[in-house]
Amino acid sequence: MFISKRNLSLLALFVFVLQLFAQGPNNTGTYYKAATGMKGQALKTALFAIISPHHNIGYDGLYKCYEQTDRRADGKVWDIYSCTTNFSFSDNVGGYKREGDMYNREHTIPQSWFKKASPMKADIVHVIPTDGYVNNRRSSYPFGETNSPTYTSNKGFSKVGPSCTEGYSGTVFEPNDEYKGDIARIYFYMATCYEDRIGSWTNGTGNTVIAGNKYPAYNPWVIKMLLRWAKEDPVSQKEIDRNNAVYK
């Protein structure tokens, strides 16, 4: 799935970014013309129609793409689940016994929720490189917040534990504050890009997050949390650079 930074930023914040509609490819001001003046569900559906054509790079193609989309300034893999890893892009084979052994492909929306179906399984917007061990500890738990973690990655960067977020008390995976906005925007993108599918992503723990409909797509506690995350962690240069690389 290829999507420009303008697309992703808009989709991520579709409930309150009408002011961005004037932008488009090469600043032509035409890309979002069909969605001008819309709001709420109508806006989301209009954006879905605009971005739905896409190119599927395939699951096996993700690792090669990561070399462009998730490269740190020092040439290592940009891992948002761990702050202590220094993976080379070839460090994606073999097993892991501890944090730092290898990285793999993490589905921010667990693929078990949508039964590993395509094209979601290989959508590089939401399938990101992360430490394999920490990814495994995340399992298919929803994203959330915990104040009594049962597991923390090195230096307390990521956490697993009972939710302290109002509206949900189950086990959650809490990413670091500096990436919560990134994840929120990915989730809004997924709700928009797959508007015609997301209602069925309720397998396993999916029903704790997915509302079973096109709009608003997520359960109230999730929407409230994601909007707060998006506000508290605005779009970073790292996020812009990644989206630009994905678009290429």
What are these regions (language model features)?
Residues 9, 29, 81, 245-246:
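Intrinsic disorder/low-complexity detector
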Residues 1-25:
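Bacterial Sec-dependent N-terminal signal peptides
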Residues 95-248:
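Domain-level detector of nuclease and nuclease-like folds
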Residues 59-64, 85-86, 91-93, 111, ...:
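Short amphipathic alpha-helical surface micro-motifs
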Residues 22, 27, 56-59, 92, ...:
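Intrinsically disordered, low-complexity segments enriched in small/polar residues
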Residues 11-13, 72-73, 98:
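A generic structural signal for short, non-catalytic loop/turn and secondary-structure boundary residues
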Residues 77-79, 83-102:
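Short, His- and charge-rich active-site/binding loops that engage polyanionic ligands
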Residues 21-86:
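N-terminal module-boundary/linker segments of secreted carbohydrate-active enzymes
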